[in-house]
Swiss-Prot record:
Gene3D superfamilies from the UniProt entry: 1.10.10.200, 3.30.70.980
GO cellular component: cytosol
Pfam families: TACO1_YebC_N, Transcrip_reg
Protein name: Probable transcriptional regulatory protein MADE_1004275
Subcellular localization: Cytoplasm
Domain of life per record: Bacteria
InterPro entries hit by this protein: Integrase-like_N, TACO1_YebC-like_2nd/3rd_dom, TACO1_YebC_N, Transcrip_reg_TACO1-like, Transcrip_reg_TACO1-like_dom3, YebC-like
Record-level GO BP terms: regulation of DNA-templated transcription
């Protein structure tokens, strides 16, 4: 599972290179979160976490504030979450999460990404049963037993704890996200997270051949260029 998360981080880092896309992604997510749960980060924990994550990804404060002000004012678009699943180049499994104010536009754009790369868009649930919806935390450290003890004392449900290359990765059911985060930060007030997110982690991996790589890269680039696409999860392992 740890390898899958490293693959996921590498894919996210590539996407993060396009700053305009990142700002737009966070602006939309923050707007929806503030609109649904309230614009005060002290009472809307999801908003607070999203703001912290945005700042860590160097999103300017004016982008964050604009999204919150827009939500607080009650105006703006009505974005709805949408999820698409299918098989990408090399027969890898793919989940595409979107936020959209126009369902017809979104499905047309996402379908085009699949069609133009000989990939196959599937029905709802086509591949998501092969992923685990997990809360994932990663930070520097090497004491697995101490981390497990902290989490057990806090009575939180944890799927796995891995230590590799001086980094601890904690996996838990997505419903336990805030309980795990609170337990860790209370035990280690100075803890700095390399990652703290809710993600879809693949149960299996699909090796992408050299022959399929150009089409796979085109597929990912096309999805990342879609304004409505927020996250792309896959089980592909690319040639090193």
């Amino acid at each position: 599972m740890g390898r899958a998360f490293e693959v996921r981080k590498a894919a996210m880092a590539k996407t993060a290179g396009a700053k305009t896309k990142v700002y737009s992604k966070y602006g939309k997510e923050i707007y929806v979160c503030a609109k649904n749960g309230g614009a005060d980060p002290d009472t809307n924990l999801s908003l607070r976490r999203l703001m912290e994550k945005a700042k860590k990804d160097q999103v300017p404060s004016h982008v964050i504030e604009k999204a919150i002000d827009k939500a607080a004012g009650g105006a703006g678009e009505d974005f709805q979450p949408m999820r698409y699943e299918g098989f990408g180049p090399g027969n890898c499994m793919v989940i595409v999460d979107c936020l959209s104010d126009n369902a017809n536009r979104t499905i047309t754009e996402v379908r085009n990404c699949f069609t133009k790369t000989n990939a196959k868009l599937g029905a709802q649930g086509a591949v998501s049963h092969m992923f685990d919806h997990q809360a994932v935390f990663q930070f520097e450290g090497d004491d697995e037993d101490a981390i497990l003890e902290v989490l057990m004392e806090a009575d939180v449900d944890v799927t796995d704890v891995e230590v590799e290359d001086g980094k601890v990765t904690v996996y838990a059911p997505h419903t336990e996200f805030y309980q795990v985060r609170t337990a860790l930060t209370e035990a280690y007030p100075d803890l700095s997270f390399i990652a703290d997110e809710i993600s879809w982690m693949p149960q299996t991996e699909t090796e992408i051949s050299e022959e399929d790589m150009p089409m796979f890269e085109k597929f990912m680039d096309m999805l990342n260029d879609c304004d409505d696409v927020q996250d792309v999860y896959h089980n592909a392992v690319t040639p090193s």
